[in-house]
Design a protein with these regions (language model features):
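Iron-sulfur-associated redox domains of electron-transfer enzymes in respiratory
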Residues: 1-169
């Protein structure tokens, strides 16, 4: 539709900030999609809150991520789909491990529980999202299924992953 190419995506707020700082001329090429952390937070505070009849102001969304840059991301502009922060608190996996240790939680002593699926079924797109080319592959798979109405079996979009076929000027 005449959009700016190439489309650049990244789930890393550190990488996005790096691009904004060092390559401001490329920011128009950045995808406007939120990161999975922020997408899920926005869904919890909008869709889930509405379905459960909960005021989004009464939901505290905590994200556990491996990177400290996720703490920076939650405070960025436009990260508030419901008029409240999409994600309220971001902690690292290391911080979670320390909390578990400090609280003396022994997972082997905990009773078995069922999986918590607040949004219902998930798609395979989520699995490939973080891999190189995964966002584009997920978008292409979703587009094909939406346009044809048929679920894809084992279709591979090999040309969208990695750097093979990329030409430098």
């Amino acid at each position: 539709n005449g959009g700016k190419l190439p489309l650049i995506t990244s789930c890393s707020p550190g990488w996005i900030k790096y691009c904004e700082h060092y390559f401001p001329d490329m920011t128009e090429n950045l995808s406007s999609c939120k990161s999975p952390q922020q997408m899920f937070g926005a869904m919890v505070k909008t869709y889930f809150a509405e379905k459960q009849g909960i005021d989004p102001k009464n939901i505290v969304s905590v994200s556990v991520m491996p990177c400290t840059a996720k703490k920076f991301e939650i405070g960025r502009d436009h990260q508030n789909a419901a008029g409240v922060p999409d994600v309220d608190i971001a902690i690292t996996t290391r911080e979670l491990a320390r909390l578990i240790r400090r609280c003396g939680i022994e997972f082997t002593a905990l009773p078995e529980e069922g999986f918590d699926d607040p949004m219902g079924e998930s798609t395979g797109a989520a699995v490939i999202f973080g891999a190189t080319g995964g966002v584009m592959e997920a978008a292409l798979r979703t587009a094909v299924e939406t346009l044809t109405g048929e679920e894809l079996a084992n279709l591979e979009f090999t040309d969208v992953r990695g750097t093979k076929g990329i030409k430098e000027a």
